[in-house]
DNA sequence: AATGAATGAGGGTTCATTCAT
DNA sequence: GATGAATGAACCCTCATTCAT
């Protein structure tokens, strides 16, 4: 694997582990066993690394976006898709968690970041559109977009705030997906479908 | 107003404006027109300021928490309450936005932070409990808690990610509250109540 | 003596000795026995030190400028005045020697530098004006200004290029002053005065 | 043209444009479209490039020096010769402008540099000797050498300090030559010759 | 001749924090 | 309560230079 790729991979791991602010360019180089000069030969600084990671994340989401029409055929497809989506987000979670810090430390990232956010919003809106095609949600388009935003925000927040820090990443992802599906539950039920495992409702 | 309070107020404003990472102890002192030594006389460092802000936020949420039983009497009470809640969150938004960066820069904040998060979770769960008391939601307690978590995450994310950066703070807050209500809409409707203004549903 | 003054003094000595490019902020701090942080507390960087030195030099020249009308009463006054002038230049010689390097490393100095150069030019022109008042030089004003420029350039160059590097600073200054007077010799002679010690002319 | 020559040419252009200190080995290689490794194959470093440029300049001045006896036949020959001399200096102006910075950054250049300076001094002295042969200057040899030094310094300074930065290079050269001739004017006049265009003298 | 990844020392700068006054 | 000079560690980055290919 080329040095450039190794830098990106290691950076992402370190950024996810300790936050982008806590990881210096030198610590990345040290973790890789390369000299700081070499790091700067491949990327002109931390900002360029982050730009590359943002682009990678954007690309991964773009691929998901393109596959939505094909993959979301029935109500059972939403949970796996949400999981794929959350998996991408989790893989690049540092980008979402440190969003605010990055905004001020690296104004140059603003455009990449807003492009990324726009794409997520599109995915969220398309998700509800597909759901509506399967069975009318009983919402105005405006309400549907609001619901899409809430869904997206809830998903983003599940990447940022770990409610069960003790559980491992995969379990957290599955729980996040379930929580998101609960938001959609009434609409899926209205479509005569309940994708979430049935439990006894209204226990005290 | 005492110097201690002025430090907290100014810090919060600066932290909200430019992020906690971008604001140094010196810049707080400069903004206040006091010497760095004086700042350190009142607070042993940036971490202590943040701890104090976390405590203030926690206190404000505690007050809201205690009033819920009294204030949430009918379905029309939920929107104002959500607004109050979001207003507190918005006032201390730097704490939520820089959560990740703070976690690593100041491990000493971890306990205060998890206490804060727990309280928000309690509020969210109590919110749905009250709703359930008004009219059964048709959810198991576990599903209800998941819904509560989604609601909370959506609220937290609306503090972290500005979807409409051009609008002013108050407008953003109202939109956030509406978005959250959309999440609850099916349950409120099931209770024979629709707190959100009626629009023509299912337009193409 | 205050730290600020000590920084300026030491910087000037080091800059003169080894050139502005060869002296780092750290080496100044080390030479003074202070920490780099303290250096940056007093000056935001090397550029601010240089700006302050340029201002000091400008001030010294301004003082000389103001005294010219009073001090240049007769032909015997020119040599001492030239020596004073050269002494100031020699004291700040790093500014003239590294002029080009500074121009590119610190564009912020451009304005201070051009102001300084303008003042030197004014002094040179006033010098010839006074000489002309003592005895007509037989030059058009335009020719007189050209002569003033040549005189100034010759003086500046004597600060930049050491023709006799083995001799000590004071001797070099005196020789420089003599060289400059030789340029003026024909005009002083025409005024019936020969301020330079008489030697036997036109030896083989 | 061989790579070696292209390196020298491009280096000289860049050094003249932005100063020797601001131009790194890498930037020269980039400007040439070659790899840094290739640059170091031809020259062991920036110092060797500068040594080569010093040698080129020295050679050009040597050629001028040898032609002086032949070319300086009459008083009208001095201006064109001065122009040729200044043109060489202007072509290699970075060497003179950054003299001080180079001295400390590259002590290895000291010998080449002092040889160069000595040659210029010889040329300046020979110039006055030829003038004296055309018509006695009325100066002792010592005074004549001092005048030669002043002339040389004035010429060097005109390469280092741009008094009229807005005018193009050729115009600056011509003005510099005129300024130098003004220094010689009294002696040329004394020889019954005025090489500078006559203007009305002693206007107020 | 030429490439380009890699090195490592060093420079400029920031900042949380201390302490004598 | 308050000042402000001082500290020192750490960070980001540049650059001359080397070397395997």
Regions found by a protein language model. Name each.
Chain A
Residues 108-134, 145-156, 160, 175-182:
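Amphipathic alpha-helical packing segments from all-alpha helical-bundle domains
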């Amino acid at each position: 694997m080329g040095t450039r790729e190794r830098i990106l991979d290691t950076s992402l791991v370190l950024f996810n582990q300790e936050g982008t602010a806590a990881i210096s360019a030198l610590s990345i180089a040290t973790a890789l066993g390369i000299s700081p000069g070499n790091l700067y030969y491949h990327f002109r600084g931390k900002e360029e690394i982050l730009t590359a990671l943002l682009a990678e994340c954007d690309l991964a989401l773009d691929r998901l976006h393109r596959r939505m029409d094909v993959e979301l055929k029935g109500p059972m497809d939403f949970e796996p898709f949400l999981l794929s989506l959350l998996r991408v987000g989790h893989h690049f979670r540092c980008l979402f968690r440190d969003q605010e810090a990055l905004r001020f430390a690296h104004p140059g990232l603003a455009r990449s970041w807003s492009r990324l956010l726009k794409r997520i919003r599109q995915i969220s809106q398309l998700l509800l559109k597909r759901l509506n095609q399967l069975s009318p949600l009983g919402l105005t388009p405006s309400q549907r977009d609001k619901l899409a935003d809430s869904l997206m925000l809830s998903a983003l927040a599940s990447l940022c705030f770990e409610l069960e820090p003790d559980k491992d990443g995969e379990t957290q992802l599955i729980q996040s997906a379930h929580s998101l599906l609960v938001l959609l539950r009434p609409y899926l039920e209205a479509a005569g479908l309940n994708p979430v495992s049935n439990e006894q409702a209204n226990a005290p």
